């Protein structure tokens, strides 16, 4: 009987704790997209809480610290290691101890302030375990209590005297970063042209506790390559060579490109239309030539295998992409829609006019070597399953719908229907179907041509693919033709219709979301589109992309906290050193999307619903 009573007490205590959590303010969610492998740019957003850290510092120290000192504190929180080194050089040695005292005290205040909305165990997870006892005293106890002022002062002084102050400051800054954002939503394209997508995955897996991915079409290339899609792999290699990023494959994923490099440099010569896009000055002519020739080799192999896939899958409706069989016999012209166009700097020497989509024996040898490496790369498998396990084609979260790309529709807003194996797919169930195919392909990787591989590649560039959202990917035209009209890629009508509230309501209904909800969309949209559309029901976030040219805007991120939603207009990111030198904040401007008259609590969230169900189950045990 005594044990039963003890269990009842434990159940009641759990109910009390869970009920208390429901009354806490809703945590802050950050929505970003199009990371594109740029780790420094990604970290600049994450460390700043997408602008939330500077807002908290302003709220806390307005009237107590000058704007300059607020900036210094914010910059320290973003980049503690670098700023500490710089501060040591700038601070007079006689004033160093006071600087440390002031800095630590301010950071303790910030940690307290940003942790107010969290239960104790969440804050504990964000704090460095090496300083658990110290932070427990400094952060959770009454720092202003008269009887303990000397005690707290002595504790901080000992941190300084024992040369522990630097590492303590760094740990507190990292805690602020984690507590400023409760959940990160990355709405597509962790991977693309950038050199460090592996570091982004590493940061999330080791340093963050609450996040999700909504896959983008560039992510599909990497996931598909791991699943054995040769077409995904060739596109991936071509893009990596185009942006001088082949070293990533070897350094991060232990993929040896020797066979491809030897083949490409023996068969092709550098051409101006395949000149790699390189920003660094420390690139040799040999490296440039390798990038150039590998691009050519991968492009031609890609076109050949694309032709085979398009012929295998008439349901893709991509016959307009069959262009190798439209080349003239001398391969200097191509016929498109009945018109002949001059080829600029062609590299079609391996294309057999009689069988233009046939892979040569030498090409086949290279492809087999590489695809076997991709499917067997331990680190690539680890990272791609991390993306798969923590991601999806779309996410319904806290009455918001998140996805990258589009939900394919016609000009009238009717969902485009796909008929596969006698069944029609459209809208929500089309995205569900593609997610099933992708994960099934990853669970059963094969390097042979198969249904899953073809459909995974289609997600990358297929006509009106939900993750691509255009009528074609004009790779051939952009490489070989000067006609700008032919190079144009038309967006699915989805993007124009996003300006209409009725269309937003239709999308929300299709995914069974309340009409008061929002759609948060990632991807490079139609240029100059307003980021807030459809009476504030659709929000475009593209905060890390380089798509906004000739502008002093670096994109957009979205924050959703207990007070509502606000869109952050971001500064262009040049590099980490520039941010530290200028002490520049990540945010240029803010725009309210939604403001709550009553502050939202955990009870209003999906997590709150989960807690309520847990409380109900516990309460039933007391009956």
Features from the language model and the residues they span:
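Feature recognizes metal-dependent phosphohydrolase scaffolds
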Residues: 1-623
